[in-house]
Amino acid sequence: MTMDNTTKTASAEPPARYVRVMGPAASMVSAIKLEQWHNATPCDEWDLRVLVNHIIGENRWIHAVLGGRTLEDVRDELNGDLTGDDPIAAYADSMALAESVLTLAQLAGTYKLSFGLATGIDYVTQMFMDQLVRNGDIMKGSGQSVAFDDELVAAAIPVAEEEVAAVG
């Protein structure tokens, strides 16, 4: 999956995968105990709260960009602490926002992102990959044992292989 490919046809698979990968994340975020929010994660610079903040931001970016707003329009409002007083509710809200823009028409569009132009399909596929990895980070940081969805992992492998091939 090259991020500069803007000719892909929209299909239901990437948004369905993204919604499926967000489900376990919602369950895991809901299970984080109060005393665990500052636990370390595999990302050296992020504790669980910062990691969940990152995911909330990604979901809100999807909503903003696929909803027609520009990076400049939303950059300030999507920086900083997005978890607020209730990170669990903030995650659930961000998930609903992301899901609300996953229509085939919006996925077929081309959007200006921080790295260049991408179709909605490419953008959602990128976010699917990020969320899948972050699910593992949440599990590790919170000590939860949740099995990865085999179909989602299988869907991620060719995307990862294409990315590796693209960078040489």
Stretches with model-predicted labels:
Residues 54-55:
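Glycine-rich loop at the start of a catalytic domain that most often binds anionic cofactors/ligands
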Residues 51:
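Extended, alpha-helix-rich binding/interface surfaces that flank or overlap catalytic cores
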Residues 2-27, 31-44, 60-93, 97-168:
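Structured surface interface patches that mediate subunit assembly and partner/cofactor docking
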